[in-house]
């Protein structure tokens, strides 16, 4: 997919992710990446999908994300650590989004687990597909693009003809926020409750100036 020049960079990222979701022919969640665009094959984990999209839509921004020396790409907790480290007047192309209500299409949301164990997920990283909405209890629901081991709410993944039980897809994740509106916990799937973990949000933008709205 070629860049759509009239769109902002976050919107271009989201368009790339949506293209993958809409055109995949095979997908499963796995740590060993196997992606073949021509065949529509996207077998990867969450950071594999994010890396694949960013390398194509925003390679200079992707290069800013730190990775471990023994890993081919940044894992989920590295996105969390990087976004958390950003200051309000950052001019390095990435901007931290503090409030859930300020999330926009193309933003990247990441969280990390307390313990980083060899051979296990370190957290999760995903693209926001659209602006969050709130429910009567004040929780936020965000449609996302990601690669996941199980479907989220109202998800393109699942059981049934033409669906895949894991891998790349789009669905809704719910978030709780604190009194200031910062995300504090997430509900990943209908079978799970809210899980409190450190959450951080990043947005690509110019390499100087402020974040794009």
Language-model features and meaning:
Residues 1-74, 195-213:
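N-terminal capping segments
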Residues 21, 25-26, 39, 48-50, ...:
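Low-complexity, compositionally biased segments
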Residues 24, 72-78, 88-89, 106, ...:
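Alpha-helical structural elements
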Residues 28, 56, 73-75, 104-105, ...:
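Arginine residue identity/basic-tract feature
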Residues 33-37, 118, 136, 186:
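Low-complexity, polar-biased intrinsically disordered regions enriched in Pro/Ser/Thr/Gly
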Residues 64-67, 78, 96, 159, ...:
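Context-gated lysine
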Residues 68-153:
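...with weaker cross-activation on analogous glycine-rich loops/strands in unrelated enzymes
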Residues 141, 147-213:
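Low-complexity, Gly/Ser/Thr/Pro-rich intrinsically disordered linker/tail segments
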